[in-house]
Amino acid sequence: MVDRWYNIAADLPGVLAPPKDPDEGESRIALLTRILPSALIDQEFTAERWVPIPEEVREVYRRVGRPTPLLRAEGFERALGTKVHIYYKYEGVLPVGSHKLNTAVAQAYYAKADGAVEVATETGAGQWGMAVSLAAALFGLKATVFMTRSSYNSKRQRLVFMRAYGATVYPSPSEVTETGRRHFRPDHPGSLGIAISEAVEYVLSGERRKYLPGSVMEFVLLHQTVIGLEAMRQLPEEPDYAVACVGGGSNFGGFTYPMLGAKLRGEGFGKTKFLAVESAAAPKLTRGEYRYDFPDATGILPLIKMYTLGHDYVPPPVHAAGLRYHGAAPSLSLLKRLGHVEAVAYGQEEVMEAALLFARSEGVLPAPESAHAVRAVIYLAKKLPPGSVVVFNMSGHGLLDVDAYEKALEWEKIYKHPED
């Protein structure tokens, strides 16, 4: 069992631009101390390479099934007719079906330690909302979740799970907050940016509440490094490529940062390249601008320097709702800017076709978000020479994404198999 998280800040090849306040209005940086547990603020700005995992958090990790397995996708290799070795780290075995529980448990623990009685958050497809709902229940906290309206209407199974864990869930934009009322209309699909603003506003409107972010913040990526640290111990051979999907960056950072950090220090993984895969509906790394922007739609939180499509950008509804975010974590953005991370974007039709191929050859139904990595692996398997090694993070299963697979089966009548 991993006993410490890895912090990429200690090994970054450039200076990570700090958060800053806008020119007008109250200090957003000071606001962080009101909405976040104090330990998380310390972790956000620390330059220490290793951060000890509290024993209480490690115990929950054990109970929910860590370490998760790393598997050879031999059936997928045969289906592709490739001699490339393909491995995947499978986070879908966790109770909520995704990697999101890794940081939800840590954040709920720190919120409880700070005296909170309730936590609030945003969620897209519902994986993060499920994780916070369960983590809150495990630590005796109330949970309130603002779920993007398009997913609230289409991902009903995850909505049921959140409520089963004891959470209160609102469709966002909602009529609960001023932010929600400003954007509200029944057919508005919502966005993670709006949902973040609603969750923060909700926390500020009550007592003993804390906000738990699902991505973008550096401490979220820190907690997720349990994935990559485990994978480094489990891999039988050094990969040529490490691949993961990107919404805000926690999945990609959690999986790749331990390997990338070792490469930057000259301690292994010298040949490994790192590929971030995003949705064509929210292509911040491939089409966004590298600049300061708000991580939320309303501008409640501090400005951070990142690749962004603009905080007012509302991505079109797609099945991979967890990737419908306008920006990427500052550390990931810097690494992409400096050329240490590659990026590619795919449309959902070719992604879901790849997901079906993986399901039929491996028996694992990928979450639509994770399927973006599967699509990229197909490309790499055709591009790389025989004997090359590719590893990717299967960040979650798609057993609660029936709507996405129903549509994929319709698309299959048109599309055969993903092409280069």
From Swiss-Prot:
Key words, A-Z: Amino-acid biosynthesis, Aromatic amino acid biosynthesis, Lyase, Pyridoxal phosphate, Tryptophan biosynthesis
GO CC aspect terms: cytoplasm
Family as reported in the entry's similarity comment: Belongs to the TrpB family.
EC number, as in UniProt: 4.2.1.20
Claim: Amino-acid biosynthesis is one of the keywords in the record: yes
Functional note: The beta subunit is responsible for the synthesis of L-tryptophan from indole and L-serine.
Pathway membership: Amino-acid biosynthesis; L-tryptophan biosynthesis; L-tryptophan from chorismate: step 5/5
Source organism of the structure: Pyrobaculum islandicum (strain DSM 4184 / JCM 9189 / GEO3)
Subunit description: Tetramer of two alpha and two beta chains.
Known catalytic reactions: (1S,2R)-1-C-(indol-3-yl)glycerol 3-phosphate + L-serine = D-glyceraldehyde 3-phosphate + L-tryptophan + H2O
GO MF annotation terms: L-serine hydro-lyase (adding indole, L-tryptophan-forming) activity; pyridoxal phosphate binding; tryptophan synthase activity
Class of this enzyme: lyase
Residues where N6-(pyridoxal phosphate)lysine is found: 100
Disulfide bonds: none
Keyword ATP-binding: no
Essential cofactor(s): pyridoxal 5'-phosphate
NCBIfam families cross-referenced by the UniProt entry: PRK12391.1, trpB_rel
Name listed for the protein in its UniProt record: Tryptophan synthase beta chain
InterPro entries registered for this protein in UniProt: Trp_synth_b-like, Trp_synth_b_CS, Trp_synth_beta/beta-like, TrpB-like_PALP, TrpB-like_PALP_sf
Gene3D superfamilies reported for this sequence: 3.40.50.1100
